[in-house]
Regions:
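Transmembrane beta-barrel domains of Gram-negative outer membranes and organellar outer membranes
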Residues: 37-312
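Cleavable N-terminal export/targeting peptides
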Residues: 1-41, 298-312
Length: 312
């Protein structure tokens, strides 16, 4: 999912947000949230789907919708509004395939706007290892940005890009009692290498999320009496970067995304600011909101298990 620069796709594929949508979904969430029962557990730790970086779980997922606004640097600078989706399905135990797409509205300064789909992306992920006692997980996989599947009006590439990636997650529930209030902390992250079939530069795509789970604090450390909606929230900060490695690719670009996730049994709503790390990335703060539907809890007959085999 590339738009003019690899950085744009890194920001836009994650989640796409407007405060009005966020407020509406939070109002629906108030109908009664419970502890999340969807995918993403290692031991007692629930790792939520993150927005700017991918989580390490090969499970059934439906991200719909994902909305964002960000103004990237350039001559001219371009304001991008993005509506996206992602669907992943576990095929074999611990192995999932996915597809994602984005519909873009681009408005360069002083020029007419253009709209259209960016290139669609296929993904594969395999959970290679996990340790429940130490709340740790490691996965391998990658993405295939399918060149020629998007609109040239929004700068979709005609060439393919393959990005082999490693994914990791670590919760800190194994810390000693003297550090018990640090146990709700967890980190997830990814490291990938772009391999374009064109003359575009190779990029190191890397990022991580640092989160503090209030549901984990309440259930696994100490019930401090938080009420809804706070007891269902996970504050986090995400860091997402793209570092060109050759072919005069320029400087590293990226964003820092502080925000919060709200967990219920059937869905997650997340909202983050998009803060550029340098002038090469952009000069204005953007916003993103994303709705993740836990389809394995809504339709357990159809989702939450592999098509072939049994992961119990």
């Amino acid at each position: 999912m590339k738009n003019n620069t690899k950085f744009d796709s890194t920001v836009l594929k994650t989640g796409r947000g407007l405060l009005a949508v966020s407020s509406a979904v939070f109002a629906v969430a108030g109908l009664g949230a419970a502890n999340a029962h969807a995918h993403g557990f290692v031991g007692d730790r629930f790792f939520p789907p993150t927005i700017a970086t991918d989580d390490p779980f090969a499970t059934d997922e439906l991200l719909l919708p994902s909305l964002s606004y960000f103004k990237s640097a350039g001559s001219p600078a371009t304001a991008t509004t993005d509506g996206g989706f992602e669907f992943d399905k576990e095929i074999f135990p611990h192995f999932a395939l996915g597809i994602a797409g984005d519909y873009l509205h681009l408005k360069p300064d002083g020029e007419p706007a253009s709209t259209g789909f960016d290139d669609f992306t296929l993904s594969a992920k395999y959970q290679l290892w996990q340790n429940d006692a130490h709340e740790a997980i490691f996965s391998i996989g990658g993405e295939w940005e399918m060149g020629g599947t998007g609109s040239k009006q929004v700068g979709a590439d005609s060439a393919n890009t393959f990005t082999p990636t490693i994914y990791f997650g670590k919760g800190f529930g194994d810390l000693p009692d003297s550090l018990k209030y640090a146990r709700p902390f967890a980190v997830t992250g990814t490291v990938g290498e772009d391999l374009p079939t064109s003359s575009d530069p190779n990029n190191l795509e890397w990022g991580f999320a640092l989160e503090y789970s209030l549901p984990y604090l309440q259930s696994q450390v100490k019930d401090i009496g938080l009420s809804a909606p706070f007891k269902n929230m996970i504050p986090l900060v995400e860091f997402s970067f793209s570092s060109p490695e050759n072919r005069d690719g320029g400087k590293t670009t990226g964003t820092i995304n502080p925000g919060v996730l709200y967990e219920s049994k059937y869905f997650q709503i997340g909202a983050e600011a998009i803060i550029p790390v340098n002038n090469t990335t952009g000069s204005q703060v953007g916003a993103v909101v994303q709705l993740e539907i836990f389809i394995d809890d809504i339709w357990p007959k159809w989702f939450g298990h592999p098509l072939i085999g049994n992961d119990k």
